[in-house]
UniProtKB/Swiss-Prot annotation:
Subunit and partners: Homodimer. Interacts with PKS1, PKS2, RPT3 and PHOT1. Associates with CBC1 and CBC2. Binds to BHP.
Protein name: Phototropin-2
Enzyme Commission code: 2.7.11.1
Cofactor dependence: FMN
Other noteworthy facts: Undergoes a photocycle characterized by fluorescence and absorption changes induced by blue light. Half-time of photoproduct formation is 11 seconds and 15 seconds for dark regeneration.
Cofactor note: Binds 2 FMN per subunit.
Reactions mediated catalytically: L-seryl-[protein] + ATP = O-phospho-L-seryl-[protein] + ADP + H(+); L-threonyl-[protein] + ATP = O-phospho-L-threonyl-[protein] + ADP + H(+)
Family membership: Belongs to the protein kinase superfamily. AGC Ser/Thr protein kinase family.
Biased composition (Polar residues): 27-43, 286-310, 325-337
Gene responsible for this protein: PHOT2
Lineage: Eukaryota, Viridiplantae, Streptophyta, Embryophyta, Tracheophyta
The record's account of how the chain is modified after translation: Autophosphorylated in response to blue light irradiation.
Length: 915
């Protein structure tokens, strides 16, 4: 018997309307359907014609650019009602629900045969209807895993109706050119209850093929049995390289400068996490959707976080500190989980930081489930990919000078997909009215390897013509040989002089400066990447270079053991080391505890799989890390003892830190926090480590407890430099002004040494909770992002959590940009401690503590009073509630070899581990 539909609540007609319009496919035998209205929004094409002054990457010239960039991370701009000139932001999902609830197209199917397929509860239906993702839910307990729920986006994307898909397996999307190997992978994952993420060619109802980035993940019950599968689809036809991902150069590397599948997979994995958590915590999601109507306004003094506020009792505040982290004995972050975030406490803003109030926060229902996922470093875009201008890069060393990179803005301007552009020559933009004499000038410039700026008529894919101010610029390598051509386009259609039928001289002059500046920025950005024409053996050549000791550590027992091998004429390699145990894994590889055979000396070995590094655009990251570590000679930074490569991996041999990670140390504390004395000690050593890095021109970019290792004596070592940025640094000695004669004292103020990296970067890298605002907005960042991360680190050490964490990446980024900084009143922290955090977490990087005077500004803060900076190496770490746990070699452990299964893990793809 069919369960009657609950009547709409008189208290919330909007919620009732949302429930009726949400897509429901639970009674598949119905012959009656109700089709709701559908609408879709598309991003307006970028013409690249920005006005006004231009920043280095020419992003955010006006509010439209801000809106466009923030929209990529789930935020929508809202014009204020009053005369305020600012822009308010709220999550896109909230804007969509409040502006037009019919956007969630409705299709219902009812039937008297209620037992045909398992029902999904009304509560779950309501929760799922709040999501913006395109996905289906299948019943894993039934043969062929029939679909029992689909989001409205699935119908919009595929063109099918509920009657046509309910009860069916998703294979109806397959067609003649669907890769059978990918289909076999999906079947194997479904059969074994595993996850899958991959791109395959699917077909819409009308036969139109499209590239579908499919992510499948299981939902399991308490006994570990798979009961549902979520299949999330993302149409990536516009931006994927498509079949070009298999196009190779003569050197065996991809013709495309960037491998886009890896980018899209990382975003998809974060997106499906929200779907999974919605199913697992549907009650909280429904409650949040009802109360989530408060807008977030930048720099607002009012409550910034969406959600209903309810005061909590003291007992509730105590539950915040309930132990919940679980770590492996080695301190590895592989399988750690954290329940201490389940009841995050939200405080009202407090400008003077003298008192706080504890207020409940609704968006924290799934934070513990995301703990292990979001602590990994992310690498979402290089500086090159974030230049929002119309440009392409071609390689004249290949036949016909094909395009190997096309910006997203270029795709919008020309209406072509990336798959249609890569591998082609730019002449596809020509048409009937294209002046061939101008085209010949471009050909002559290519032949002569010189730059040229011209204007000509080009055509979009749909046949629309536009006036293109085109700038061609050659790019040469360090030897002066031609490497690439950079082609920048600017749509000048709105500035054509009718009588002359061309751009005016003034417009051409101004626009020429703009396209030339863009080409210069592209030239700088592309140099961060390895030369696409490099032979694979040359790409990893740096890892085969010998390593020699630097002055301060050359007499250590670790170096003496390595030097014995070098003295014998041998090259240090994998065969010299015996695997002991795995220590953990990061974004680019796995870390092993190893022993140098015959010496008893222990080291840490980081192994990175070559194919995975290439597929995920991380080859240059591995090379940068090797270069950086080879320069380090400091007690709070790792020492490189050797680097080498095998046929499949590149390896780095560095210090083994038996104290494990600071993350694990925090985890073991009864309250999951450190005392101020301990936090001060560790923060001080981090400051000194960062000061040394900045002096070398290195921006760390991934400071977090997982990357702070502890030596046996309790002192720190900063680890993992694969996300770091290396540039130049010009040290300065600032002489203080001499005091007046009247006030002259015996002690003269000492000069201040300041050394901060001088160049900006615009890569989108870091760890979600620690990323600085300027990285999210794409405004370009300097070493000031490390001081922001120091503020987050201090907050986590003192309060047991980070201040801006949200239930998903979009919400975390929204919080980082707009949420007021508050402090839990249930945990006493001194005023100077809160003041230091507040000045470090200044959203304006130019006003952030440390941005002008570097580490010296931070050292002088009152929080660090009592720290003897020159002698901090000799200090004993303050006592801890739970002492340091030392990782030791187990004498009874079974001997293992590198050839054994699972010892040197070959991770060739992105992993999904949501459960």
């Amino acid at each position: 018997m069919e369960r009657p539909r609950a009547p709409p609540s008189p208290l919330n007609d909007a919620e009732s309307l949302s429930e009726r319009r949400s897509l429901e496919i639970f009674n598949p035998s119905s012959g009656k359907e109700t089709h709701g209205s559908t609408s879709s929004s598309s991003k307006p094409p970028l013409d690249g014609n920005n006005k006004g002054s231009s920043s280095k990457w020419m992003e955010f010239q006006d509010s439209a650019k801000i809106t466009e960039r923030t929209a990529e991370w789930g935020l929508s701009a809202v014009k204020p009602d009053s005369g305020d000139d600012g822009i308010s932001f709220k999550l896109s999902s909230e804007v969509e629900r409040s502006k037009n609830m019919s956007r969630r197209s409705s299709e219902e199917s009812t039937s008297s045969e209620s037992g045909a397929f398992p029902r999904v509860s009304q509560e779950l239906k309501t929760a799922l209807s709040t999501l913006q993702q395109t996905f289906v839910v299948s019943d894993a307990t039934q043969p062929h895993c029939p679909i029992v729920y689909a989001s409205s986006g699935f119908f919009t994307m595929t063109g099918y109706s509920s009657k046509e898909i309910v009860g069916r397996n998703c294979r109806f999307l397959q067609g003649p050119d669907t890769d059978k190997n990918e289909v076999a992978k999906i079947r194997d994952c479904v059969k074994n209850g595993k996850s899958y993420c991959g791109r395959l060619l699917n077909y819409k109802k009308d036969g139109t093929p499209f590239w579908n980035l499919l992510t499948v993940t299981p939902i399991k019950d308490d006994q570990g049995n798979t009961i549902k599968f979520i299949g999330m689809q993302v149409e990536v036809s516009k931006y994927t390289e498509g079949v070009n991902d298999k196009a190779l150069r003569p050197n065996g590397l991809s013709k495309s400068l960037i491998r886009y599948d890896a980018r899209q997979k990382e975003k998809a994995l974060d997106s499906i996490t929200e779907v999974v958590q919605t199913i697992r915590h549907r009650k909280s999601q429904v409650q949040e959707s009802v109360s989530n109507d408060t807008m977030v306004k930048p720099d607002s003094s009012t409550t910034p976080t969406p959600g209903r506020q309810t005061r909590q009792s003291d007992e509730a505040s105590k539950s915040f500190r309930t132990p919940g982290r679980v770590s492996t004995p080695t301190g590895s972050k592989l399988k750690s989980s954290n329940n201490r975030h389940e009841d995050l406490l939200r405080m009202e803003p407090e400008e003077l930081m003298l008192s706080t109030e504890v207020i409940g926060q609704r968006d924290s229902w799934d934070l513990s489930d995301r703990e292990r996922d979001i602590r990994q470093g992310i690498d979402l875009a290089t500086t090159l990919e974030r230049i929002e201008k119309n440009f392409v890069i071609s390689d004249p060393r290949l036949p016909d000078n094909p395009i190997i990179f096309a910006s997203d803005s270029f795709l919008e301007l020309t209406e072509y997909s990336r798959e249609e552009i890569l591998g082609r020559n730019c002449r596809f933009l020509q048409g009937p009215e294209t002046d061939q004499a101008t085209v010949q000038k471009i050909r002559d410039a290519i032949r002569d390897q010189r730059e040229i700026t011209v204007q000509l008529i080009n055509y979009t894919k749909s046949g629309k013509k536009f006036w293109n101010l085109f700038h061609l610029q050659p790019m040469r390598d360090q030897k002066g040989e031609l490497q690439y051509f950079i082609g920048v386009q600017l749509d000048g259609s709105d500035h054509v002089e009718p009588l002359q039928n061309r751009l005016s001289e003034r417009t051409e002059m101004q626009s020429s400066k703009l396209v030339k500046a863009t080409a210069t920025n592209v030239d700088e950005a592309v140099r961060e990447l390895p030369d696409a024409n490099t032979r694979p053996e040359d790409l990893w050549a740096a890892h085969s270079k010998p390593v020699y000791p630097l002055p301060h550590n050359k007499e250590s027992t670790s170096w003496k053991a390595i030097k014995k091998i070098q003295a014998s004429g041998e090259t240090v390699g994998l065969h010299h080391f015996k695997p002991i145990k795995p220590l953990g894994s990061g974004d680019t590889g796995s870390v092993h505890l190893v022993e140098l055979k015959g010496t008893g000396e222990l080291y840490a070995m980081k192994a990175m799989e070559k194919t995975m590094m290439l597929n995920r655009n991380k080859a240059h990251r591995a090379c940068i890390e090797r270069e950086i570590i080879s320069l380090l000679d400091h007690p709070f930074l790792p020492t490189l003892y050797a680097s080498f490569q095998t046929s499949t991996h590149v390896c780095l041999i560095t210090d083994f830190c038996p104290g494990g990670e600071l993350f694990a140390l925090l985890d073991r504390q009864p309250m999951k926090i450190l005392t101020e004395d301990s936090a001060r000690f560790y923060a001080a050593e981090v400051v000194i480590g960062l000061e040394y890095l900045h002096c070398l021109g290195i921006v760390y970019r991934d400071l977090k407890p997982e990357n702070i290792l502890l030596k046996k004596d309790g002192h720190i070592v900063l680890a993992d430099f694969d996300l770091s940025f290396m540039t130049t640094c010009t040290p300065q000695l600032i002489i203080p002004a001499a005091p007046s004669k009247r006030r002259r004292s015996k002690s003269q103020p000492l000069p201040t040494f300041v050394a901060e990296p001088s160049t900006q970067s615009n890569s989108f890298v870091g760890t979600e909770e620690y990323i600085a605002p300027e990285i999210i907005t794409g405004a370009g960042h300097t070493s000031a992002i490390d001081w922001w991360a120091l503020g987050i680190l201090l907050y986590e050490m003192l309060y047991g959590r980070t201040p801006f964490r949200g239930k998903n990446r979009q919400k975390t980024f929204a919080n980082i940009l707009h949420k007021d900084l508050t402090f839990p009143s249930s945990i006493p922290v001194s005023l100077v401690g809160r003041q230091l955090i507040n000045t470090l977490l200044n959203r304006d990087p130019s006003s952030r503590l440390g941005s002008k005077g570097g580490a010296n500004e931070i050292k002088q803060h009152a929080f660090f009073r009592g720290i003897n900076w020159p002698l901090i190496r000799g200090m004993s770490p303050p006592p801890l509630d739970a002492p340091l746990s030392i990782i030791e070699k187990d004498p009874n452990a079974k001997d293992i070899k590198w050839e054994d299964d699972g010892v040197l893990v070959n991770s060739t793809d992105l992993d999904i581990d949501l459960f």
